[in-house]
């Protein structure tokens, strides 16, 4: 079953799903802006198109991830994003 989600007044939208190949995941698009997300469980984020500038928990330097690149976020934490262009992503819940 598909589950639609909307965050930050519609600037981030995602569709959650479960499949045998990826497990529980969501795909989405972020409009330009700055966002902070909290995690309940570990997440693996893959940038599909565009780019995300990311500040991960426990780090002091921002890092840019572009299409095809992956980063991991620990559970029970938060991470910060800067988005300069519409960017799509795949989020797997680990």
Curated annotation (Swiss-Prot):
One of its GO terms (molecular function) is purine-nucleoside phosphorylase activity. This is Pyrimidine/purine nucleoside phosphorylase. Belongs to the nucleoside phosphorylase PpnP family. Catalyzes the phosphorolysis of diverse nucleosides, yielding D-ribose 1-phosphate and the respective free bases. Can use uridine, adenosine, guanosine, cytidine, thymidine, inosine and xanthosine as substrates. Also catalyzes the reverse reactions. The gene is ppnP. Coiled coil: none annotated. Keywords: Glycosyltransferase, Transferase. Its EC number is 2.4.2.1, 2.4.2.2. It holds the Pfam family Ppnp. It comes from the Bacteria. Transmembrane segments: none annotated. GO terms for cellular component: cytosol. It catalyses: a purine D-ribonucleoside + phosphate = a purine nucleobase + alpha-D-ribose 1-phosphate; adenosine + phosphate = alpha-D-ribose 1-phosphate + adenine; cytidine + phosphate = cytosine + alpha-D-ribose 1-phosphate; guanosine + phosphate = alpha-D-ribose 1-phosphate + guanine.
